[in-house]
Amino acid sequence: MRFDDPMDEFKRNRKMEEDSKKVIDVKVAESDKGFAKFGKAEVPFHIPTLTKPQEEYKILVDNANNPFEHVLLEKSEDGLRFIHPLEELSVMDFVDRNLSEMRPVKPLPLEETPFKLVEEVKDLEDLAAALQSVEEFAVDLEHNQYRTFQGLTCLMQISTRTEDYIVDIFKLWDHIGPYLRELFKDPKKKKVIHGADRDIIWLQRDFGIYVCNLFDTGQASRVLKLERNSLEFLLKHYCGVAANKEYQKADWRIRPLPDVMKRYAREDTHYLLYIYDVMRMELHTMAKEDEQSDSPLVEVYKRSYDVCMQLYEKELWTRDSYLHVYGVQTGNLNAVQLSIVAGLCEWRDRIARADDESTGYVLPNKTLFDIAKEMPIVVAQLRRLLKSKLPYLERNFDAVISVIRRSMQNAAAFEPVVQSLKDRRPETVVEMNIEPKIEKTDTGASASSLSLEKVCVDDSKKQSSGFGVLPLKRKLESDKTVVEKNIEPKIEKTGTEASASSLSSKKVCVDDSKKQSSGFGVLLSKRKFESDNKVKEEVKVSKSKPDKVIIVVDDDDDDDDDESYEQSTKAADALDRVSETPSKGSPSLTQKPKTCNTEVIVLDDDDDSESREDEDMRRRSEKHRRFMNMKRGFLNI
């Protein structure tokens, strides 16, 4: 009966915790509760003035465009794959036994725990000896991805039940593997890591370390179905520690490490073994989902086993690598632009490998796409595109311009790729309906049963500029999507009381299959519905012919050239002439556009009993349409 006491005590503690909404009591000194007293993070994401550790500490890296060789692993008989040490072991070899006898070991307060900064080989030797004498230890790594091509481990934190260690990786780079490799591989020693997916492959890549017998607290939190899976949440939930995560993305290459960063690094592992204890108890008492499934504890070890079985693979450049750059698949690029993207991706990959920099540091994706869309062919144009300091681009302006020009000449080869990208995009429909909005100016007015059918625009080609969202139903090039939105037309009364009822118009289709070269795209909207481009729609209804609706669209985009302005003004003048003599007592049919960026769509209903005025309006509207078609034809030449 004595052996059941710890488990019974654990269950009672957890029940009390659930009832009182409190965590298990862990004595934590006031100074341990996060970093609040240290203020905001003083170390930014990137410190450009730092000497690269690869250069300062003579760290050798292999960025050649060849597969990564796991030189310490044996190969399969066919020579096609590497054999991980875990393949000789079973998950069940690591599952805890006799948990009913176990008590969670509460951690000492951070200030009372011995701490060692490992910077010399002798210190590393002492650490290895200390790990030989324990059954489990917690591990975490700090990493830098921005100033190196493959990534660079910057710091290793290790905690036992009694002591915390921080290993200065840079100073001991060539010694980490020889001293720690066998300890991480030892299946009898439990390694506790939170969210180990990346840590596992970083250890393989930089030090040839392969982990066996892992308990991943991140996987455990998922099996336990906790509210959140982050280490920050676990520290608060189980230990009452409010961890400050502002240093999570700090530049960990900095040396010497500030005290506040040392403290942050220690917190990542200091409490982890206690969290591991409590989680095991919870998993042990947790019911299985069904009879066929594994126990929750076994499930965590299976997931942890799978995490360890990952093998690092180097990123290789291929002819199609540019297609995997974020934004290419949905960027709606034409053949010339896509060719430039491919050329610049290859250029930055070559530079990044040679100088051991990330491709994002050499040429960020946003700048890459800006260049591809603007297609600068002289240095002055390229320089104007830069929004921030990019050293590699600034040192290689001429080379980049050469890449752009060469890519533009090779654009024809990318036509099939552009078509393939379009074909892959799913087609969706979003509807856009019109509901009338009635405004009174002098006397009351009413409107009912106003319905306008969909106006279809095929926007299957790129537009370089144009008006805001005018088409009520249209295809968006970016994702081969038909979008329909709700538009509320404004019905305005300017004279005596009038009413609009049963107003309807038929479907009007506009072919926007050609590229627009200026802002006078009239019916042609931008490919995306953007919140910052607010489109104003005004609908005015004629009393004499209430089934004619003129929609005036005003886009506040004033980036158009002088030619567009002149042509737009002519169109506005033509519109004025269409309706300069409205019938007596009827509301004004038009309103002079507020800016040059306006257009009119006349939606007609076939009616044989038209009045002379309506017939005149139809003829004038037809002239307007012909003018529009002529303009489109001019732009398509």
Curated annotation (Swiss-Prot):
Residues 553-624 are annotated as: Disordered. GO terms for biological process: exonucleolytic trimming to generate mature 3'-end of 5.8S rRNA from tricistronic rRNA transcript (SSU-rRNA, 5.8S rRNA, LSU-rRNA); gene silencing by siRNA-directed DNA methylation. The keyword Nucleus applies. Keywords: Nucleus, RNA-mediated gene silencing. Residues 118-283 form the 3'-5' exonuclease domain. Disruption phenotype: No visible phenotype under normal growth conditions. The double mutants rrp6l1 and rrp6l2 have a late flowering phenotype. It comes from the Eukaryota. InterPro entries: 3'-5'_exonuclease_dom, HRDC-like_sf, HRDC_dom, HRDC_dom_sf, RNaseH-like_sf, RNaseH_sf, Rrp6-like, Rrp6p-like_exo. This is Protein RRP6-like 1. The lineage of its organism: Eukaryota, Viridiplantae, Streptophyta, Embryophyta, Tracheophyta. The gene is RRP6L1.
